[in-house]
C-alpha cells in the first residue's frame, strides 16, 4: 500500500481507496488510527481501551493538510472508540470515526474495532462468471432489511434473512436483491436514508462477518446483490460529520447550502476531500 499516493489522491479529490489509510486498521504493531481533521488543534483516541478520558492517546500530524494518525498496540477486536477533538476555539468534541468499519447499536454512538482482513469470501466462482447483464434480463427485488420480516420485536439477522429470502427470490424468478441502505444510521424511521457511518455496516442485523456470509450464500445461489447508497446528505447528530473538527468540513460553509429539506446536512461536493470520501465509500 502506497500511503503517500493515497494521501495525495485524497487531497486531490479523486481517491477511490481512501479507506485503506483512514479509519482503524489492524497492523503488525497494533491498530493504526487515521483521521482527517484539518481545523483541529489536537486530536486524541479515546475508548474502552483508554478508560475513555483517563488515558487518552494523543495523535500525531501525518502532514500539514490535516491528517492525524497513531498506532496503538495490544487492542482487541470489537473494542469501542471515538476521536476527542480540540477545536481552534478550545472546545472539545467527541466524534465517531468517519471511516469506522463498524459501530455500536443505537442509541450508543461509538465506533467499534473490526479486523476486515479476517473476512473470508467464498464467491470467487460468482465473481469470475458475472457480466454487466447487458445480454440478459434482470428482475430486481428491493427490500428494507429492517421491515421485510420480524423475529418478534426484532428484525431478522443476516443469517435468518438468508434462510428465508434466498428460497423466496429463487421461487419467484428474481435475479438480484437490492438492499436499502445498510450504512449505519441513528433513526429507524429513516430506513437508512439518513446516514451517520458511510463505511460502517449497520449493527442492527449483524456484524460485517455475518453480512459476508449472507452475500456468499446469495452468490452461491446465483443471486446478485445491489446496495443502495446515499451520497447527498448526512445526519446532524453531534457525534457525526457535522462540524466535525469545529468548523464546516463535510458540509457547505454557508447555512443555506448546508441544510437540506430533510433536516440533514448536504455534502460539500466542491471539497476535494469530501469527493474522495464519497467515491471511496462507493468503491468500498
Tell me what each language-model feature is.
Residues 36-43:
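Short proline/glycine-enriched turn/loop motifs at strand-loop junctions of beta-rich domains
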Residues 43-45, 81:
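Short beta-strand elements bearing conserved aromatic residues within extracellular beta-rich modules
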Residues 35, 47, 72, 85, ...:
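Glycine-rich, histidine-containing beta strand-loop boundary motifs that form or position
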Residues 55-63:
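Short, surface-exposed loop motifs enriched in S/T, G, D/E and P with embedded aromatic residues
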Residues 1-32, 62-142, 147-155, 160:
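The feature marks proteins involved in alpha-glucan
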Residues 126-137, 144-284:
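Substrate-binding/active-site clefts of carbohydrate-active enzymes
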Amino acid at each position: 500500500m502506497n500511503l503517500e499516493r493515497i494521501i495525495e489522491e485524497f487531497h486531490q479529490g479523486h481517491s477511490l481507496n481512501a479507506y485503506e489509510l483512514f479509519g482503524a486498521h489492524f497492523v503488525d504493531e497494533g491498530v493504526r488510527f487515521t483521521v482527517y481533521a484539518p481545523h483541529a488543534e489536537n486530536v486524541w483516541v479515546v475508548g474502552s481501551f483508554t478508560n475513555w478520558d483517563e488515558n487518552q492517546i494523543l495523535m500525531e500530524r501525518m502532514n500539514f493538510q490535516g491528517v492525524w494518525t497513531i498506532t496503538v498496540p495490544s487492542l482487541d477486536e470489537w473494542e469501542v472508540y471515538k476521536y476527542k477533538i480540540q477545536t481552534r476555539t478550545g472546545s472539545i468534541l467527541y466524534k465517531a470515526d468517519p471511516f469506522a468499519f463498524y459501530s455500536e447499536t443505537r442509541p450508543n454512538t461509538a465506533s467499534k474495532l473490526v479486523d476486515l482482513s479476517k473476512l473470508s469470501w467464498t464467491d470467487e466462482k460468482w465473481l469470475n462468471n458475472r457480466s454487466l447483464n447487458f445480454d440478459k434480463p434482470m428482475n430486481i427485488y428491493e427490500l428494507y432489511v429492517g421491515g421485510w420480516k420480524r423475529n418478534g420485536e426484532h428484525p431478522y439477522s443476516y443469517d435468518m434473512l438468508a434462510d428465508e429470502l434466498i428460497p423466496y427470490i429463487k421461487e419467484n424468478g428474481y435475479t438480484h436483491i437490492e438492499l436499502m441502505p445498510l450504512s449505519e444510521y441513528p433513526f429507524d424511521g429513516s430506513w437508512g436514508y439518513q446516514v451517520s457511518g458511510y463505511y460502517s455496516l449497520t449493527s442492527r442485523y449483524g456484524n460485517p462477518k455475518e453480512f459476508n456470509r449472507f452475500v456468499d450464500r446469495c452468490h452461491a445461489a446465483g443471486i446478485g446483490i445491489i446496495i443502495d447508497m446515499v451520497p447527498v446528505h448526512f445526519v446532524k447528530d453531534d457525534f457525526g460529520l457535522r462540524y466535525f473538527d469545529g468548523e464546516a468540513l463535510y458540509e457547505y460553509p454557508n447555512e443555506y447550502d448546508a441544510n437540506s429539506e430533510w433536516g440533514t446536512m448536504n455534502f460539500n461536493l466542491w471539497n476535494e476531500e469530501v469527493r474522495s470520501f464519497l467515491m471511496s465509500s462507493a468503491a468500498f
